[in-house]
C-alpha cells in the first residue's frame, strides 16, 4: 500500500510538471522571449551598409495610388545606373500586368533586365493554380530560372503547405534576374515575427528567402547545404547558422536591431518620392535631390509602408521590438543578420530538458534539506542567478528558456513543501498519539508545537500539585495475579485521566499505583488551586463508581488518598541533553506527596495544605487535622481534610 501511494504521488507530480511545462513553454515563454530580445539583444542600430527606400505616406500624397510602373522604373533606374549600390532588393510581388499602361510596364521590365544586382520578391501560396497544366509549366520555368542548388540532408515528411507560386507577368518574369521569397510567418501563440524562413519548401524543392538570395549573390555562394539543425553557405566567406523546421520552411531566429530615433525603422530610410524626384532631375540635367553617392557600396531594399494612406499599403507586423515593424525593415534585418552572422541561436529540446531536470532536482534537494523559510531564500537566489545567466546569454545572442525552468522549480517547491507539510503533520499526529500514552497530551502539545526550542531549563512558577495513591496496594498485589493488577490499574488510570484534563490539570507521571498531576503549568490557569480541589473531588466520586463495578465483578475494593499543595516550584525540562523530562520539583511537590501519605496516618482521604486552603476556603468545608513541620521553615503548617465542596 505504501509503495502504491508513492507511485501515485510520483505520477501526480509528473502530470503537474508536464502540464506546467506545456502551459509555460507554450503561452508564457514566447512573451518572455520578446522582452529579452527587446531589452538585451536589440542594443544597436542596423548596419549603415543597408538602407531602405520606402513608398511612404509622403510618396502616396505626391503620386496617386495605384502607381504606374514607370515610377518603380525610375527608382530602379536611379539605383541601378546612377549609383554604385551593391544590391537592390524589391520587397514586393508583381503579379498582374498594367492593362491601362503597358508602356509603363515595359519601362520597368527594360530597366531591371540588365540589373544583375536586382532581386525581386515572390510568395508561396496556399491557393491552387486556376489551370493546373499551365501551373505545372510555370513551376518548371520558375525552378529552372530561380532555383539555387541546395544539398538537402533532411527528409521532408510533412504534407505540402503550398500549392502555387506568385504568377509573374511574362515580361516581368523574362526580365527579372533573381528572385527570393518575401513570405514571413508569425508565431502561433502571440502573433509576433520572431524568426524568418530562409528556405521555403515547395513541391519537393527549397527556394531561398529574399535575404538569403541577396546574401548568396553578395557572397558568391557556390553551395548551400541544409542539415537537421543548420544552414551552411559556402562562398567567399563560409556561413553556418542554426535553423529549425517550422510550417513549410527552414527558419532561423532574427537578431533585431534598435530603432532610429523617432522612427519605426532600424535602418536608414529614404522616401521613394525623393528618389523619383532625383531621377527626374538627373534626366532633366539638373542636380538631384539626393546625391547618388549616398548609395555607393550600399545594399538597398525597396518596399511600401504607407500607414496613413488608408489604401491598405501599411506593411507592418508585430516583432519583439515594436508592435508595427515595417516588413521591408524585417527583410533588411534578415540580410543584415546573415552578413554579420548575428542570427539568434537557441538550445536544443534535449538541452532544454536537461536544464529543466537539473533545476527540478535542485529544487527537490532544497525541499529535502531546508525549512520553508530557508528554502524560499535559496529559491530566490537560484532564480536571480538563473535570470542573470539568461540575460548574459541573450546578450551573447543565445536564447534560453527563462520563465519555464523557473516555473518548474517553483511548482516543484510548492509540491515538495506541501507534501512535506502533510507528511510532517501526519508524523506529528502519530508521535502525539504514541507518546501521549506515555506522557501528558498537554506536554506533548507544547513539545510538538515548539520542537525547535526544546532544551534543558525552566522557570519558577506558582502551581498546585496533586498526588493520589491507592490504599493497601501492596497487600492487594500479593493476592492478585499481575494481569489482574494491570487490568485494575489501567481501568483506574483511564477513568481519572479525563477528569484531570477536564480541570486543566496535566498528569506529570504515574508512580506505580500513584499519580502526580500539575495545575497552573504548562496550562496557564489563575484558578489552578480551585480546579485541583474540584478535580480531586471528582476523582473520589469516580472511584466510588468503580468500587460498585468492581464489587459486581468480584474484584477487591480499593480506596485512594489525595494530597494537594500550592506554592512556588521549578517547572521545566530536567535530565540530559539527549533525554529530557518535563516535570515540577521543589518543596511544594514534596509537601504534596507527604500530605497524600498522611492520609494513612489520620485515616482520611483528602488532605490539603494551608496554602491551598487560602484559595479554596470559600468553596469547601474542611476541618483542621494537624500541624506539620516544613523543612527550611520555622513555623509549622496546618493541614486540612476536605469534607465536601459547597460550590
What are these regions (language model features)?
Residues 453-535, 582:
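Catalytic NTP-binding/metal-coordinating core of nucleotidyl cyclase/transferase enzymes
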Residues 347-419:
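Transmembrane alpha-helical segments that form the functional core of multipass membrane systems
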Residues 569, 598-647:
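Cytosolic regulatory/linker segments at or just downstream of nucleotide-handling modules
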Residues 490-505, 521-562, 566, 587-598, ...:
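Alpha-helical scaffold within the catalytic cores of cyclic-nucleotide enzymes
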Amino acid at each position: 500500500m505504501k509503495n502504491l501511494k508513492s507511485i501515485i504521488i510520483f505520477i501526480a507530480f509528473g502530470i503537474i510538471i508536464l502540464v506546467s511545462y506545456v502551459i509555460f513553454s507554450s503561452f508564457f515563454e514566447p512573451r518572455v522571449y520578446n522582452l529579452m530580445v527587446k531589452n538585451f539583444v536589440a542594443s544597436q542600430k542596423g548596419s549603415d551598409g543597408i538602407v531602405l527606400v520606402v513608398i511612404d505616406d509622403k510618396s502616396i500624397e505626391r503620386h496617386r495610388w495605384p502607381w504606374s510602373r514607370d515610377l518603380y522604373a525610375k527608382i530602379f533606374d536611379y539605383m541601378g545606373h546612377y549609383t554604385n549600390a551593391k544590391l537592390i532588393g524589391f520587397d514586393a510581388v508583381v503579379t498582374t500586368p498594367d492593362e491601362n499602361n503597358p508602356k509603363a510596364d515595359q519601362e520597368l521590365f527594360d530597366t531591371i533586365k540588365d540589373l544583375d544586382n536586382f532581386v525581386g520578391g515572390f510568395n508561396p501560396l496556399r491557393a491552387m493554380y486556376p489551370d493546373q497544366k499551365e501551373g505545372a509549366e510555370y513551376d518548371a520555368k520558375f525552378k529552372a530560372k530561380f532555383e539555387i542548388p541546395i544539398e538537402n540532408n533532411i527528409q521532408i515528411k510533412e504534407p505540402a503547405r503550398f500549392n502555387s507560386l506568385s504568377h509573374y507577368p511574362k515580361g516581368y518574369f523574362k526580365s527579372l534576374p533573381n528572385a527570393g521569397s518575401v513570405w514571413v510567418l508569425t508565431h502561433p501563440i502571440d502573433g509576433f515575427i520572431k524568426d524568418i524562413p530562409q528556405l521555403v519548401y515547395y513541391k519537393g524543392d527549397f527556394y531561398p528567402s529574399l535575404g538569403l538570395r541577396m546574401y548568396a549573390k553578395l557572397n558568391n555562394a557556390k553551395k548551400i547545404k541544409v542539415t537537421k539543425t543548420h544552414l551552411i553557405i559556402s562562398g567567399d566567406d563560409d556561413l553556418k547558422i542554426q535553423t529549425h523546421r517550422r510550417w513549410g520552411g527552414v527558419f532561423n531566429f532574427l537578431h533585431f536591431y534598435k530603432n532610429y530615433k523617432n522612427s519605426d525603422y532600424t535602418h536608414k530610410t529614404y522616401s521613394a518620392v525623393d528618389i523619383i524626384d532625383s531621377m527626374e532631375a538627373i534626366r532633366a540635367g539638373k542636380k538631384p535631390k539626393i546625391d547618388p553617392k549616398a548609395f555607393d557600396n550600399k545594399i538597398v531594399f525597396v518596399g511600401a509602408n504607407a500607414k496613413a494612406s488608408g489604401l491598405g499599403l501599411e506593411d507592418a507586423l508585430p516583432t519583439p521590438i515594436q508592435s508595427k515593424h515595417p516588413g521591408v525593415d524585417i527583410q533588411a534585418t534578415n540580410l543584415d543578420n546573415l552578413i554579420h552572422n548575428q542570427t539568434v541561436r537557441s538550445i536544443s529540446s534535449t538541452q532544454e530538458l536537461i536544464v529543466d531536470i537539473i533545476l527540478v532536482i535542485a529544487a527537490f534537494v532544497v525541499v529535502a534539506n531546508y525549512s520553508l523559510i530557508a528554502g524560499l531564500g535559496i529559491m530566490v537566489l537560484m532564480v536571480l542567478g538563473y535570470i542573470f545567466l539568461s540575460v548574459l546569454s541573450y546578450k551573447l545572442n543565445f536564447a534560453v528558456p527563462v520563465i519555464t525552468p523557473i516555473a518548474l522549480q517553483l511548482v516543484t517547491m510548492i509540491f515538495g513543501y506541501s507534501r512535506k507539510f502533510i507528511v510532517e503533520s501526519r508524523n506529528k499526529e502519530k508521535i502525539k498519539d504514541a507518546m501521549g500514552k506515555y506522557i501528558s497530551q498537554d506536554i506533548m502539545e507544547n513539545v510538538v508545537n515548539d520542537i525547535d526550542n526544546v532544551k534543558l531549563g525552566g522557570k519558577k512558577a506558582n502551581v498546585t500539585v496533586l498526588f493520589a495513591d491507592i490504599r493497601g496496594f501492596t497487600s492487594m498485589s500479593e493476592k492478585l495475579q499481575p494481569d489482574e493488577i494491570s487490568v485494575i490499574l489501567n481501568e483506574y488510570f483511564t477513568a481519572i485521566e479525563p477528569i484531570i484534563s477536564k480541570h486543566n490539570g496535566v498528569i506529570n507521571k504515574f508512580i506505580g499505583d500513584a499519580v502526580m498531576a500539575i495545575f497552573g503549568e504548562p496550562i496557564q490557569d489563575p484558578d489552578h488551586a480551585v480546579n485541583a480541589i474540584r478535580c480531586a473531588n471528582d476523582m473520589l466520586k469516580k472511584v466510588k463508581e468503580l468500587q460498585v463495578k468492581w464489587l459486581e465483578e468480584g474484584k477487591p475494593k480499593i480506596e485512594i488518598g489525595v494530597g494537594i499543595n500550592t506554592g512556588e516550584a521549578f517547572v521545566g525540562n530536567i535530565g540530559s541533553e539527549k533525554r529530557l523530562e518535563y516535570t515540577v520539583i521543589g518543596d511544594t511537590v514534596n509537601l504534596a506527596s507527604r500530605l497524600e501519605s498522611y492520609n494513612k496516618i489520620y485515616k482520611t482521604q483528602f488532605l490539603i495544605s494551608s496554602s491551598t486552603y487560602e484559595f479554596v476556603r470559600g468553596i469547601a468545608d474542611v476541618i483542621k487535622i494537624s500541624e506539620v513541620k516544613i523543612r527550611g521553615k520555622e513555623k509549622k503548617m496546618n493541614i486540612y481534610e476536605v469534607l465536601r465542596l459547597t460550590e
